[in-house]
Amino acid sequence: MMNKICLYLPLFFSSLTMANEPVERVISLAPHATEIAYAAGLGDKLIAVSEMSDYPKEAGELEKVSNYQGIKLERIIALQPDLVIAWPAGNPAKELEKLKQFGVPIYYSTTGTLEDIANNIEQLSQYSDDPSKGQKAARDFREELTALKAKYNTTEKVRYFYQLSEKPIITVAGKNWPSEVFNFCGGENVFANTAAPYPQVSIEQVITRQPEVLFTSRHAMSDDGMWAQWKNELPALRNNHVWSLNSDWINRPTPRTLNAIIEVCEHFESVKRKR
């Protein structure tokens, strides 16, 4: 279960193993990396992607060479890519090392901040035929972030709980993705200080922390009524502050994260207006 969840939650940092020059055959090994590749102007160079790469629509038509269980090492080598966009937090380290041993150039993408989304687009754009496309996408992303920061009041905090899965109940802690999206909007994570990056928690622990807002997503719950019996114990339920987020927007650090920010910030603003 945790491996499946991690497919949506990449950690963002990047490193390059080759000189920046245009490439012709690109493989992406994570859904967020696929979206970043398109934004960077490499969409027409992609020849294979990860199993859950479904955006943009064209990505869904490409050959699938990885999933939460691992990567198809022999197939990737046979495709002779001149750039693989890898995700160290989700792709097996031993398999990535084997790709390197076969001389496959790898761009490593892991997570950190919203700014890293723009940085990764810029870096990958250097491998496209027209780097200006990716540079513009990165610039537009930064400008929209600035506009959103000016629009929403983030000084007044809202205590929230974000549910990543149902059985077991898993959430996010610390600065791990997508915590920064919620922080951007003035959110205060009720499990922020938990040691594990994606801790398993109990219903009782959630109730004890009394979140004002409870966020889920379509990937998080099969039973929409799992919290209903706790309405009297949870402020979020008593005040109808339970919302389902678009999991692709919120869990993948890509240009579409801007949509997640708007979604989360609007929910928080509605809570503040009722105070």
Swiss-Prot record:
Q: Name one GO molecular function term.
A: cobalamin binding
- Indicate the segments forming the Fe/B12 periplasmic-binding domain, all copies: 25-272
UniProt name for this protein:
Vitamin B12-binding protein
Record's function text = Part of the ABC transporter complex BtuCDF involved in vitamin B12 import. Binds vitamin B12 and delivers it to the periplasmic surface of BtuC.
Report the SS bond pairs.
Answer: C185-C265
Q: Which GO terms describe its cellular component?
A: periplasmic space
Per the record, the major location class is periplasm
Q: Name one Pfam family in it.
A: Peripla_BP_2
Q: Which GO terms describe its biological process?
A: cellular response to iron ion; cobalamin transport
Q: Give the record's keywords alphabetically.
A: Disulfide bond, Periplasm, Signal, Transport
Q: Which organism is it from?
A: Vibrio parahaemolyticus serotype O3:K6 (strain RIMD 2210633)
Compartment list: Periplasm
Q: How does this chain assemble? A: The complex is composed of two ATP-binding proteins (BtuD), two transmembrane proteins (BtuC) and a solute-binding protein (BtuF).
- For the site labelled Important for BtuC binding, the residues are E74, E204
Q: Of which family is this protein a member? A: Belongs to the BtuF family.
- Name the lineage: Bacteria, Pseudomonadati, Pseudomonadota, Gammaproteobacteria, Vibrionales
Q: Which PANTHER family match?
A: MOLYBDATE-BINDING PROTEIN MOLA (PTHR30535:SF34), VITAMIN B12-BINDING PROTEIN (PTHR30535)
State if Signal is listed as a keyword: yes
The answer to whether UniProt assigns keyword rRNA-binding to this entry is no
Q: Where is the signal peptide?
A: 1-19
Q: Which domain of life is it from?
A: Bacteria
